[in-house]
């Protein structure tokens, strides 16, 4: 387990934390946390709180609404998991916490973190359960009947079990929207608003995400009350430890360029992002034909196949994962050292989520962007948006990677 003292630091000046009640607390022991929760935190492998944890946990425990922003790989999931667990009363086997995630994989990962950090708080190992699409609704109904204190799920399935009357909302204390920018995008906004219709009016709402565009902050005014804001300056929104490069290449030469990279560079594990399911399958097929151990994943695959692919990649049995933006948000694979954007993302926010797959928890990582002539303007937009510089890949790149 990667420990928090290995998480990529965010500079104190990176935070716009001029609101009252937002001050860094450098030790978990100095936070208002139950002893059994502290046991779980240290048992999980955390030693010192990351920057976002230093700022977000204490305001979370006070019960007010929160908008918190932190880069991928900086302990964001730990921050809201700890804050959420502190707010719950484990003497009552009632559903009190709800976490909404944009993907099944992220929901499953989040539930595991909450379960492990909270293992000394509950007599039941099943106090936290997942509710996601691609599984039998009947199984979810049985989970709820047996008793759940924390529910983690995707909006569609959570909305379904609420409407069935199986997930009772009157005892809910806390709602967390993870990857809030995605959750409030056009695809999820209607489902989120539908869920809010069933929630207690005094429920605590916490939004956590790596990016928080102004339009999302405007949307939050509809359902949040005087939230504490813990935001990062835009110029700080490129991960420390991630070196970014581009290769100028025409579309028809991208595959050959990719093959050349894998022939000349020693890569521990890498993620390749493409923008369509068809291209993902094609890249994976070509790499496998060239004797590379490659896995591929996209949203149209069955849930069981996606879980199998992720387990294979996490274990190191597969060293290359080709995927769409499905895994760009929050999927934890600690040994990825190179991210390749075979296609530049269509949306600037997803660039940050993608390159966050490399160099997680303070490790050195590299992002390589394949840029066609028509992509040049988008590349400049990404540089301007994050106040960063993306250099052309040096000729001696293999030597650089071996440093």
UniProtKB/Swiss-Prot annotation:
eIF4F is a multi-subunit complex, the composition of which varies with external and internal environmental conditions. It is composed of at least EIF4A, EIF4E and EIF4G. It comes from Leishmania major. It catalyses: ATP + H2O = ADP + phosphate + H(+). Belongs to the DEAD box helicase family. eIF4A subfamily. The lineage of its organism: Eukaryota, Discoba, Euglenozoa, Kinetoplastea, Metakinetoplastina. A motif (DEAD box) lies at residues 178-181. GO terms for molecular function: ATP binding; ATP hydrolysis activity; ATP-dependent activity, acting on RNA; RNA binding; RNA helicase activity; translation initiation factor activity. It holds the Pfam family DEAD. InterPro entries: DEAD/DEAH_box_helicase_dom (IPR011545), DEAD_box_RNA_helicase (IPR050079), Helicase_ATP-bd (IPR014001), Helicase_C-like (IPR001650), P-loop_NTPase (IPR027417), RNA-helicase_DEAD-box_CS (IPR000629), RNA_helicase_DEAD_Q_motif (IPR014014). The keyword ATP-binding applies. Residues 1-29 are annotated as: Disordered. A motif (Q motif) lies at residues 26-54. Residues 241-401 form the Helicase C-terminal domain. GO terms for cellular component: cytoplasm; cytoplasmic stress granule; eukaryotic translation initiation factor 4F complex. This is Probable eukaryotic initiation factor 4A. Residues 57-230 form the Helicase ATP-binding domain. ATP binds at residues 70-77. ATP-dependent RNA helicase which is a subunit of the eIF4F complex involved in cap recognition and is required for mRNA binding to ribosome. In the current model of translation initiation, eIF4A unwinds RNA secondary structures in the 5'-UTR of mRNAs which is necessary to allow efficient binding of the small ribosomal subunit, and subsequent scanning for the initiator codon. Its EC number is 3.6.4.13. It comes from the Eukaryota.
């Amino acid at each position: 387990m990667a420990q928090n003292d290995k998480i990529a630091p965010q500079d104190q000046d990176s935070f716009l934390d001029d609101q009252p009640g937002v001050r860094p607390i450098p030790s978990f022991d100095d936070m208002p946390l139950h002893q059994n929760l502290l046991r779980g935190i240290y048992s999980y492998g955390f030693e010192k709180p990351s920057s976002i944890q230093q700022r977000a946990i204490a305001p979370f425990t006070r019960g007010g609404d929160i908008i918190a922003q932190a880069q991928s790989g900086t302990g964001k999931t730990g921050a809201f998991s700890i804050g959420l667990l502190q707010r719950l009363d484990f003497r009552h086997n009632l559903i009190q916490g709800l976490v909404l995630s944009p993907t099944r994989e992220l929901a499953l990962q989040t539930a595991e973190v909450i379960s492990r950090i909270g293992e000394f708080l509950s007599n039941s190992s099943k106090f936290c359960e997942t509710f996601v699409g691609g599984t039998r609704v009947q199984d979810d109904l049985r989970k709820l009947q047996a008793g759940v204190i924390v529910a983690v799920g995707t909006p569609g399935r959570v909305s379904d079990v609420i409407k069935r009357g199986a997930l009772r909302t009157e005892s809910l204390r806390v709602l967390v929207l993870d990857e809030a920018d995605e959750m409030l995008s056009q695809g999820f906004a209607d489902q989120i608003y539908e869920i809010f219709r069933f929630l207690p009016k005094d429920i605590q709402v916490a939004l956590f995400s790596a990016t928080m565009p102004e339009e999302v902050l405007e949307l939050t005014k509809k359902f949040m009350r005087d939230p504490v804001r813990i935001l990062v300056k835009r110029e700080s929104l490129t991960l420390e430890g991630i070196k970014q490069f581009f290769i100028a290449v025409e579309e028809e030469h991208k595959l050959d360029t990719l093959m050349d990279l894998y022939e000349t560079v020693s890569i521990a594990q890498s993620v390749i992002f493409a923008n369509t399911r068809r291209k993902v399958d094609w890249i994976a097929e070509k790499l496998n034909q060239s004797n590379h151990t490659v896995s591929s994943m996209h949203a149209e695959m069955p849930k069981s196949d996606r879980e199998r692919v992720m387990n294979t990649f996490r274990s190191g049995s597969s060293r290359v994962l080709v995927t769409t933006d499905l895994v760009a948000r929050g999927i934890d694979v600690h040994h990825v050292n190179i991210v390749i954007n075979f296609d530049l993302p269509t949306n600037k926010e997803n660039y940050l989520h993608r390159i966050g797959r490399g160099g997680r928890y303070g490790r050195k990582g590299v992002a390589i962007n394949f840029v066609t002539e028509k992509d040049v303007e988008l590349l400049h937009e990404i540089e301007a948006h994050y106040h960063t510089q993306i250099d052309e890949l040096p000729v001696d790149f293999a030597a650089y990677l071996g440093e």
